[in-house]
Every structure is written in structure tokens, then in C-alpha cells.
Amino acid sequence: MMIEPYYEGMEQQKKYPIRNTETVELAWGGKLVFNTCIVGGAIDARFMPAILKGIMEKMEEGPLTGSYARDIVVNVFDGKMHPVDSNEMAFKLAGRNAFKEAFKNAGPKILEPIYDIEITVPSELMGGVMTDLQSRRAVVMGMDSEGMNTIIKAKIPLAETYRYSTALSSITSGRAVFAMQFSEYEAVPSDVQSKLLKAYEEQTKDEE
């Protein structure tokens, strides 16, 4: 099994001949593109739905940090059948296990929700607000003037907005207001991903 990240307009892989493609719109967002690349009858076509089901179960459980996996191309190019033990359950389990291993080897990235944030603040207090935004991994996209106020437009990870209302009120003595709206998902920085993976490993170790 070979896994690739999916994105709109991407070219199909050329390493293995694709016999059939199924695109699944995932209930939690994003897509799964399932390519059957089996040649020579290594796996009967009747078992491919079971493999797909196993993959989707593992994607929903979260093979990396317990969070949904999305926007993935899966290429199934080889396998084996047993004259007695081959059945749908066996291939569903094989699909789960193969996906888990291939997913980790594919260098997956953890995505986080990014929000557009617009802050209206008295111009003389803008510096403190900007410093706080930088500490929250926000990216300032632009600023406008409106009378005695400055409107700051930025993108900020949702994870960094915890208690932001309280912090902004403290910085500006309650003289600033803000509004937020979902924008997109982006990969977290590598240092943040390392911390999340370590925390998840410790959590699952404690649960065992």
C-alpha cells in the first residue's frame, strides 16, 4: 500500500498501473481517493470493498493522534490471498493495519483550523495587541485606520485563541473588540507537531 497527500488538480502516480479509482467524500471533511493497482489477480476484486472499509475505519479513528485523517490517496498494489482464510473480515483488518503502517511512513502532517480575526483597537494601544498576536502564532494580513482606531486583520490558529477575549480586554482596558471566522486548515509547525505526538503517545501509554 502506498499513500500520498491529496489535493485538487494533482497528477496520478505513475509507479503502479491504476485499474480502478473510487473517490469518497468523507463525513468529517476532505476526500479519500482509493486506487486499485492490483495486477495478476493477487487480490480478488470482491475483497477491495472490505479493504476500503478497513482503511476508512482507521482514518476515522485517527492513525496519528486520534484525530480524523483526510485528503489522502491510497494505492493498493499488492497482497496475498489464502485458499481457506481469505474473507471480508480478514481483508478489512489487513486494510486497517496496512493503512496504519503506510500512513506513518508517508510523513503525515497534523492540520489545525485557522481563523480570520479582525480587531478594532485604539491606535495608541495597537502595539500591545500586535505583540500578543505574535505570541499566538498569528499572521497579520493588513491594517486599516478608522478615526482614532486601527483595524488589524490577521490569521490565527484556533488553538491559540483560548481566553483571547480576556487577554485583549486586559491589554486594552476593555477598549478593543474582535470578530473571528473560520478560514482554512493548515499544517502545524514541526515543533508543535512533535509536542502533540509526544503528548498523544504518553496519553495512550497511560491508558494501556
What are these regions (language model features)?
Residues M1-E208:
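Accessory interaction regions appended to the cores of large information-processing enzymes
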